């Protein structure tokens, strides 16, 4: 259902403590993100954008505030419930692809299914479906260390998708890719959002922000603007899918 509210944060605070010094990484962050959106979180280095992403991913607990996921305050869950929720509802893509080098693509994608207690009989079908979404089903039994850089990151996206999560979180997912592979990965993420997944990316690249539906800007831990119309990107235009490089070209 389009316009379904997936994420709502209410006065979200994250503080870090360095001796007697308090570092305010997030200050009363209030955001809403809907199903099928591809949203960029942007801001200067040290602004709190990655902190917000990690709080949304339940990797860093907030100091105060509420985090509602489909209307449920998941901060009230036990640690065990949060871990199960994270494995089933969230998918992660990081800047440095962390596939296990001495394992096959299948074995890498099987791990989150094992953690989510998926029965063995259905795992291969789920893995092939996820790989097909990024054009890599033909690599399912290949060693991950034999993949190109772009293929490894696409396999990482497939791994994020394998449990059919509601939310994909990416922390600079194209940071180590060249321009050609960056365009491929971003268009694949846009296609994933069009299929009803919600995609949230931390990025410092204006062109990636321009490819998103919306930009949330953060400065000094505070949300200072929310919406593409509030963020002017000079000499960058939003590309249509036909302008992007196709997967078959690599």
Residue ranges and their predicted role:
Residues 5-218:
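ABC family nucleotide-binding domain
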Residues 1-2:
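Short, low-complexity, intrinsically disordered N-terminal peptides in bacterial proteins
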Residues 222-248:
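Conserved beta-strand-loop-alpha-helix hinge in the C-terminal portion
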